[in-house]
Structure formats: structure tokens, C-alpha cells
Amino acid sequence: MSGGTFPAFVSAGDILTDMVRAGDAQWTSVPGGAGWNVARAVARLGVPSALAGSIGEDCFSDVLWRTSDAAGLDLRFLQRVARPPLLAIVHETRPPAYFFIGEASADLAFDPARLPAGWTDHVKWAHFGCISLVREPLAGTLAALAADLHARGVKISFDPNVRNLMTAAYRPTLAKMAALADLIKVSDEDLRHLFGGDGPDAVAAVRALNPRTAVLVTRGAQAATLYADGDVHEASPPRVEVADTVGAGDASIGGMLFSLMAAPQRSWREHLAFALAAGAAACRHTGAHAPTLDEVVALIEG
């Protein structure tokens, strides 16, 4: 999607190609990136969206461009530069084992100054997270962008979405982004990696980073908890036949953000139900599926 209007939602940072082992000497390339998945999820549900990031001019980046266009994302926010692509090499899938190839790669060249003039006057929510907040100089660029948007009154969503690049050096960025956020989403895996456990103490540590913000804690097929406006809401995801859990967390936060933008009159409990249904709908498909509104509503209505 391009044109004179501006998206209400922008996800900034993560867009890459997953190289997934398909045999001893075979690999399959798949468009990916947590931030990109969230942008696609929100767009598929019905809110005009964009992925603000940078890709190369190579064959992998051509696929990312075409797939972003097909997903309805605003291509004015996706920059192209003459640099190599960022690749995630997924050499095992059960459980996932991976590493990244991306020295001086295209994602690091993202420049907010090249985004279309006036977009910040129209965006309602902006999303940040995952490896883009670890890889410099991109991490600093995105943290500064988040701070600027926050100062302008744009609501900020933050999902750490833990990857193996997040060492102790990530802590200051975690604290900075959490302080800016109006919504923080963490999984039980995030809690274990960042805080050494997934129990009440770990949840309390997340909430202490920004006591005023809403915090969504997901636990796969188990009950999720939402802390918001002084209340605690708990709900279980709809039961579905699981084909794949890849991208389920991205679909879940995408569902939450869509619900907050499209139906702000809903209660927090209703927003939580929508988010969990979106994540469950994604699990019915292989790959990082962006569910339709009909799929999500059908699960909510049972």
C-alpha cells in the first residue's frame, strides 16, 4: 500500500530472510523478522500498516519487497540500499537453533529521516523489539525514534522477543524501551532468558521497569496474564489443532494492537481475548501466518 494517506500503525526494525535447513545440503529461504510479522498481522486484520526498515538490492530483498507489497504494507517506509541482506540461518527447527549473518548489512542503514514527511502526525501506535534493538547502529537509531515518537504522543509497543544476541549488554536498552512503552509483551521464554525464571519475581521485575504501562505475559498454550490499569486479567488461548507455533507471539501482539486501535471502547479483558485468539489462529498454519479478522472472530465466538 502506498499513496497520499499514512498508516496508523508502524512496526520499526526487524525484516530479514530466514534460511531454514531442509536437508543435509538443502535450504529454504523464507521472508521473516518479528517486526515484519507484527506489521503483516495488523495489516491483515484491517489497520493500515507499515514496516519501517531497510533491505538490500539482492534477490532475497526482492522477495521481501514483493511480499511486503502483497501484504498491503506501505512501501514508502521500506528503504533499499546497496548492502548485503540480513540472514537468519536456522540449522535446526526442533528446538530452533540459529545464528545470524549480517555484518554491515542493509538493516543497519535504516534512516528515519528518509521516511515520508508528515507520517508522525498520523501514526497512532509504533512497535519495537527483537534483534533490531541489539544490532548497532540500528539499535540506537530505533531507540531515538521511539523516544521522539513517545514525545509526540504516539503510543509505543515493545516486545523484547528474546534472541541469542541479547547478552548483559542489552539491559540498558531493555530498560530504556520499557520506560517508553505503553504496552510491553513478554513470553515465558523471554522471562527465563532476561530474568532467570518465569515466576512471579520475574513478572514483578518486568513490571518494575515501567509500573504505569500495560504488560502482557504469554505462556504458549497456557493461560496468559494482562496487567493493566491496576487490574489483573487472565485467560487461556482457544484450543486449536497446532500446525506450527512460528510467529504466534507476533500474531498475538499484532492482535492486541489491532484491537486497541480498531475498538478502543473494548475492555482490557476483551483486548486480551482478541490477542490470544489471533495467536491461536496463527498456530493453525505453517510458517508465520497472519490471520484474517474472520479467523480470529470465529475462535472468539467459539
Feature map (PLM): residue ranges:
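Conserved phosphate-binding/catalytic region of the ribokinase-like
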Residues: 1-8, 199-302
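Glycine-rich phosphate/adenosyl-contacting loop at the front of the ribokinase-like
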Residues: 1-73, 242
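Active-site metal-binding loops of divalent metal-dependent hydrolases
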Residues: 13-15, 34, 131, 160-162, ...
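Conserved N-terminal subdomain of the carbohydrate kinase-like
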Residues: 19, 48-130, 154, 300-302
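Short, conserved phosphate/pyrophosphate- and ester-handling motifs at nucleotide-, phospho-/glycolipid
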Residues: 42, 187, 249
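Active-site beta-loop-alpha junctions enriched in small/polar residues
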Residues: 103, 131, 161-165, 189, ...
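Conserved phosphate/ATP/ADP-binding segment of small-molecule kinases
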Residues: 152, 165-232
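Short beta-strand/loop segments at the ligand-binding rim of alpha/beta enzyme cores
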Residues: 152-160
